[in-house]
Regions:
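Membrane-proximal transmembrane or re-entrant/amphipathic helices at the cytosolic face
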Residues: 2-26, 454, 467-517
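Membrane-interface helix-loop junctions in multi-pass transport and translocation proteins
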Residues: 58-66, 143-144, 166-171, 182-215, ...
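Membrane-interface junctions at transmembrane-helix termini in multi-pass inner-membrane proteins
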Residues: 152-176, 360-394, 441-446
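Signature of the first transmembrane helix
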Residues: 3-17, 28-88, 123, 149, ...
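Hydrophobic transmembrane helix module of multi-pass membrane transport proteins
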Residues: 4, 8, 13, 113-254, ...
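Transmembrane helical elements of multi-pass membrane transporters/channels
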Residues: 34-51, 205-225, 234-305, 325, ...
Length: 517
């Protein structure tokens, strides 16, 4: 698909004389770099907080209890995402369109009211009909309280999206990387030692963590936006807003669902303990996935502002730049977590080591998915319906492939861990195809190729694999303490020298700031 657009190969920006360097791309790239850099530190905080939770959940609660928790979690978060009506990315466009016309707080409160209404109705439904949450039929009234997380999750998405529109990524980091993960880790440990709450400890800890994150987001939101002025519900306008948001909300749910449908299908074909093992592998693999979401809040506002001026060259440049940043960082982290995978999974508990194969394929899936994610960040604004159909086709293909591979494992009488690996392979293939199709579509719409792949990633991976193979000869604790940093160092040294040019290194220059806040 050619070289990724950069200031040196995309030509002059429309509206500027030929040969005149564009004035704004540096500011936009700096804004993207600043937001991504802030959230990258948030990723490191997530890593530090996620591991204690997995350790507590695996060692204290066990794989079967984790599987039961994961089944409920899938439904709760999917429904909450639908109830947020795609505001995680759609709010930026509504705020941009309303500039100078409506008070921004009023725009946000339209979404908050709708999300509250839909999420409360959903919570009531699942309280009365809990079977989808607990397919095993094992639950009590304390477990059912997890439905109260649906409104909290949906509202958190909206207030954090509002802050991101003002380039305030630090609030997202505080809520998602500090408050939520540390709250669930601490409370899961506390509830385990309270006999009456022990069996529902994971569900209750999750519920508390969601509202702790919401409180963090609301504090910053009210300070920066304030209370609405002259706002009142407008049923007709909100009905139009709901209809308009459906494609985006569905696309969000499908994109999220591609990383959860595997758990649902495993629950139908595998034992609860196998689902719990896969959930742990997925949680470890989702750590590099957070690097993609690091750029989503800031990429949306930047793209919408360039769409207003129809500056497609700059959009292509930004998508490719962010795509390479994500791919390069994810590949390094995937190697660091995947090569010593047995030690990583063994940290949670000896019964989880069987999920090492699934972990490897899940980490690879996150790397190949980077192109799809950054392409979709633009497609939701320029080809919303076509993007939706591609997403639907992706999850349908993944579901069919997952079931087919699991049945193949059964046919050859392989043990349960192979079913988890089969689900991970299906995810990797589906996300890879989605990346290819979405990049081609976006390139045709913008009139410029979209390709964030560079062979330097392969050259950097080679020494990292060699180092990783060496550290697997060490004791497990040494693999984790010394091996992971050594792999990252080997990979980072090569990718910095061979893969990163001046534009790429903006991500690591703290003295570069966007022109406009």
């Amino acid at each position: 698909m050619g070289l990724p657009p950069t200031p040196s190969n995309v030509g002059p920006v429309p509206g500027t004389p030929a040969g005149t360097p564009p004035e704004e791309p540096d500011g936009d790239i700096a804004a993207l770099a600043k937001g991504g850099r802030t959230n990258f530190f948030g990723f490191l905080l997530r890593l530090a907080a996620r591991l204690p939770f997995l350790f507590i959940a695996g060692r204290l609660y066990g794989a079967a209890e984790l599987g039961r928790f994961a089944s409920a979690l899938v439904v709760v978060e999917l429904v909450a995402l639908l109830c947020s009506l795609g505001e995680k990315r759609g709010l930026a466009q509504r705020l941009a369109e309303g500039e100078g016309k409506k008070h921004p707080t009023n725009v946000v409160f339209d979404g908050i009211l709708l999300a509250t209404l839909f999420s409360c109705l959903a919570a009531l439904f699942f309280w009365l009909v809990p079977a989808p949450l607990f397919p095993s039929g094992e639950y009590n009234w304390l477990d059912l309280l997890i439905v109260l997380a649906i409104p909290g999750y949906a509202l958190t998405e909206i207030v954090l999206a509002a802050q991101a529109y003002k380039y305030d990524i630090a609030t997202t980091v505080r809520a998602r990387a500090v408050v939520e993960p540390w709250t669930i880790s601490i409370m899961a440990g506390v509830f385990y030692f309270v006999p009456v709450l022990q069996s529902s400890g994971l569900n209750l800890a999750y519920l508390i963590s969601i509202y702790a994150g919401l409180a963090t987001g609301l504090w910053s939101f009210l300070k920066s936006y304030g209370l609405p002025k002259g706002w009142r519900p407008r049923p007709r306008a909100m009905s139009r807003m709901t209809v308009r948001a459906l494609p985006l909300a569905t696309a969000d749910a499908i994109e999220w669902g591609t990383r959860r449908i595997d758990i649902f299908l495993l629950g139908l074909f595998a034992a609860p303990a196998a689902v719990g093992v896969y959930y742990v592998a997925q949680q470890v693999a989702s750590l590099p996935q957070k690097l993609k979401t690091s750029f989503e809040p800031i990429l949306g506002p930047v793209i919408t502002k360039n769409l207003k001026t129809k500056n497609y060259v700059k959009i292509a440049q930004q998508v490719c730049q962010v795509g390479f940043w994500i791919t390069a960082m994810q590949a390094g982290i995937a190697l660091a977590l995947g090569v010593p995978g047995e030690a990583v999974m063994g940290l949670v508990g000896p019964n989880f080591v069987g999920g090492t194969g699934a972990l490897a394929f899940l980490l690879a899936a996150e790397v190949v998915a980077a192109t799809a994610v950054v392409s979709e960040a633009a497609l939701i604004y320029v080809a919303r319906v076509r993007n939706l159909w591609i997403s639907i086709a992706t999850i349908a293909f993944q579901a069919v492939l997952t079931v087919g591979l699991i049945l193949l494992v059964d046919e050859f009488n392989y043990p349960e861990p192979y079913k988890a690996a089969a689900a991970a392979i299906a995810l990797m293939i589906a996300l890879g195809l989605a990346s290819l199709v979405k990049a081609i579509l976006l390139g045709r719409i913008l009139g410029h190729p979209v390709n964030n792949w560079r062979w330097a990633v392969v050259w950097a991976a080679a020494p990292a694999v060699v180092v990783g193979y060496g550290v697997t000869r060490l004791p497990e604790w040494a693999e984790l303490v010394f091996g992971i940093p050594a792999i990252l160092l080997a990979y980072g040294w090569v990718i910095w020298r061979k893969g990163f040019g001046p534009e790429d290194r903006v991500l690591f220059r703290r003295n570069v700031a966007p022109d406009a806040e």
